[in-house]
Amino acid sequence: STPSNSSAASDVYKRQVDIKQSECTIYECIIDRANVQDAILDTEIDSLKVISSHINLVGAEIEMLNLPNREKILKEVLTPLKKEYDYILIDCSPSLGLITINALTAADSVIIPVQAEYFALEGISKLLNTIKIIKSKLNPALEIEGFLLTMYDSRLRQANQIYDEVKRHFQELVFNTVIQRNVKLSEAPSYGVPTILYDAESTGAKNHLALAKEIINRNK
């Protein structure tokens, strides 16, 4: 989860209060080494579980500075869950701080979202350099799962130019699926539900389902 807890808040609605009042979040697992099983929450989707973030995670990087093997804490937390779940998704903030480094160290692969805007391209090289360092120092098995175009509007020339540029550079690593601009994607979090439950027929929901299928097919 991101430090702001946005992913957890949008993926669950029945247990919103539980998340806000939960005594065990990913923060406690990282800082206090709480049992990760105690942090797992059910959702309205039977096969989907979440681990909530906490606002305290914003300052966790400072608390982690004096901890041993601080770059590998999240990996140690999540390793017991690997045999229980087909996929574990770690939602990261855009910043390349210690929490994100922990996520990249724990991950098997990374999905790189690219907003269909010019300035989004500037951050890619920095992220790729970080991934290169992580691979050489902390996680040799880390791979790029793919580049995902988001906030895409095919009517805009710039969006198509960005897509073509990313495709030219990264070729087969670019997902065929794009996440289009869709009002339902911005509405759903305000109701505390994932888009697939808010409006399964919306463009945003269909885009995410297509992405899920593409990821599954890539990993067969």
Spans of model-derived segments:
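P-loop NTP-binding core
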Residues: S1-K220
